[in-house]
Amino acid sequence: MKKFTKDEAIKIVVQCAQAYQKELDGKSLLFLCTDKHKRVFPFEFSFYGNNYLHLTGLKAPKGADGESAGLFANDFYQKCLDHKLSPADFEFSEDGTTHMKLEVLPTVIFKNLQAKMIGDYNSSKPRLYTEKVAGSTNACVGFILDQTMQKYVPN
């Protein structure tokens, strides 16, 4: 797994934010799937600007009190779109997931996203909370039901 520098991370997330805005932001994708009994069932996933920060794996920087500082998901996304993101605006996740997410981010932010597998997540990994998973053996995206909107969104 490649370890990215902050400058490399900025280049990736700024470039991908432009594609995310064009391809997914404010849109829903409908996947039609078949189960082993050949029954067809739909999965609809919706994408919004406030989901982008989580997709990158980057975290808001911590303040002097050890709590996350005031960079919110929408602010982060707008800074990416405006090409104004700086190294001080984010941190890498301590568990290493940021680097994994940055490596696959350019491949999962397109409306022509193909998923070889879609299904319920079985909670087999203790630090991953999600309800639905869509992807392949190379990358996947987790989704949860947003209780306010009653839509599945990336988490």
Predicted regions located by residue number:
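Compact beta-sheet-dominated globular domain cores
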Residues: 133-155
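An acidic, glycine-rich, mixed-charge low-complexity segment common to nucleic-acid enzymes
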Residues: 1-128
